[in-house]
Amino acid sequence: MLDANLKTQLKAYLEKVSQPFEIVASLDDSDKSRELLGLLQDIVGLTDKITLKTDGSDARKPSFSLNRPGADIGLRFAGIPMGHEFTSLVLALLQVGGHPSKLDADVIEQVKGIEGTFEFETYFSLSCQNCPDVVQALNLMAVLNPNIRHVAIDGALFQDEVEARQIMSVPSIYLNGEVFGQGRMGVEEILAKIDTGAAARDAEKLTARDAFDVLVVGGGPAGAAAAIYAARKGIRTGVAAERFGGQVLDTMAIENFISVQETEGPKLARALEEHVRHYEVDIMNLQRASKLVPAKNAGELHEVRFESGGSLKAKTLILATGARWREMGVPGEQEYKAKGVCFCPHCDGPLFKGKRVAVIGGGNSGVEAAIDLAGIVAHVTLLEFDSKLRADAVLQRKLYSLPNVEVITSALTSEVKGDGQKVTGLVYKDRNSEEFKSIELEGIFVQIGLLPNTEWLKGSVELSPRGEIIVDARGETSLPGIFAAGDVTTVPYKQIVIAVGEGAKASLSAFDHLIRTSAPE
């Protein structure tokens, strides 16, 4: 199951296991059970600290639990955790085996203090880059607190459950049999939902912080670069972000970040955060900005208010809140989001195996999505508003070579149809004939560009007609002492490498502003 190179790497990791435990597998006579058995035998063959039993009686087969004598740990994988979930498996082995987590001590204590009964189930796909964060967070919580149980379920292997629960997006998380959430979540986000008093406590702590010399709002590539450049100047630096990594977390293959030949979004996001944490930067996650209150007079502090109820003050600000997927804005879209309307073909594509889907958008992202999906689904219809596709020629050639793809141009998507539970089709207007036409399908993947996260800034800094923050050559906004960088600004070409450079530039400009405004007259 594991090649020699992977065995060597895993053996080195398993040397960190300090407490013996057992793997209990529940198997049947299927090929997948035999495949899982091979994986588990490979694992126990690398260390004498782990033993394997194959007499498990769990209803989900193939599956396995990790059990440590003397500890009540409710952690199970249903399926074969390879692909993106192999890291989740390795971390689970280490944590059940007594290796400490890198999670902040305060968060660990908060997890340990949770009371009640929490039976979590997470449905994932092996190609989903967002799923491991959820799986790893809940696995760790299950290791730390016996009141928390978690099963990570490969939706592709348990299609009957996926169909019964009408799951059309991963990760999908259930708590005690009810829908808990969808999409990427970390430990702190999960805690915020189950520990109802945490939000108020965190807001108080946030507001109590001293003012920063530079406060970066946003934790994507631009925000990370800005924080590093500021911290290296020896000034008090903070980063307040809804999620560190930003939109990079939702990006699959990255092959144009100079000096890194190939990587994946979550991996790059982790590297960015590790680099920032190397310096004295106060990182405040799960903070979504709600209002900017600029300083009224020179020498006063700017204030940023957050949806959590907390606020922060700073001498200078760098706004790097990035952008999000643009939605179609048509009837039915919100109702059927995550019920057939999706934005991540890598994550959710496997759930539509053998089904019919549409991709909305004929740029590079739309055409790449259609190409990826064509290898999984029965049929792909790509709809483009313009009279021609806008993707690179090499991508278009690949697209048109696929037998199960239809391209419709001059098409305005006008409605998402459904049966109250899931998507059943869409309606589009032929812009040439003005005729409305219907397509029967099960999934819609929206790939029509980005929308800047600037709603909270209206009435403060100057915005372009597209809602982007207008900046000058130094990254400064229309308000002195407030700078901006990355996809949220008017700087053209929304690329990671450009965002990093713009973040560094904005930070240098902010430092220059601090020097000039604090210099004695």
Curated annotation (Swiss-Prot):
InterPro entries attached to this UniProt entry: AhpF_NTD_C, AhpF_NTD_N, Alkyl_hydroperoxide_Rdtase_suF, FAD/NAD-bd_sf, FAD/NAD-binding_dom, Ferredoxin-NADP_redctase_2, Pyr_nucl-diS_OxRdtase_2_AS, Thioredoxin-like_fold
Annotated cofactor note: Binds 1 FAD per subunit.
EC class name: oxidoreductase
GO MF annotation list: flavin adenine dinucleotide binding; NAD binding; NADH-dependent peroxiredoxin activity; thioredoxin-disulfide reductase (NADPH) activity
Keyword NADP listed: yes
Binding sites annotated in the UniProt record for NAD(+): 356-370
Keywords linked to the UniProt accession: Disulfide bond, FAD, Flavoprotein, NAD, NADP, Oxidoreductase, Redox-active center
Superkingdom of source: Bacteria
Enzyme Commission numbers on file: 1.8.1.-
Reported cofactor(s): FAD
Paired cysteines (S-S): 344-347
GO biological process, one term: response to reactive oxygen species
Residues that bind FAD: 213-228, 477-487
Gene Ontology CC terms, in alphabetical order: cytosol
Entry keyword annotation includes Cytoplasm: no
Function, in words: Serves to protect the cell against DNA damage by alkyl hydroperoxides. It can use either NADH or NADPH as electron donor for direct reduction of redox dyes or of alkyl hydroperoxides when combined with the AhpC protein.
Assembly: Homodimer.
Other information: The active site is a redox-active disulfide bond.
Similarity comment: Belongs to the class-II pyridine nucleotide-disulfide oxidoreductase family.
Protein name as it appears in the record: Alkyl hydroperoxide reductase subunit F
Origin species: Pseudomonas aeruginosa (strain ATCC 15692 / DSM 22644 / CIP 104116 / JCM 14847 / LMG 12228 / 1C / PRS 101 / PAO1)
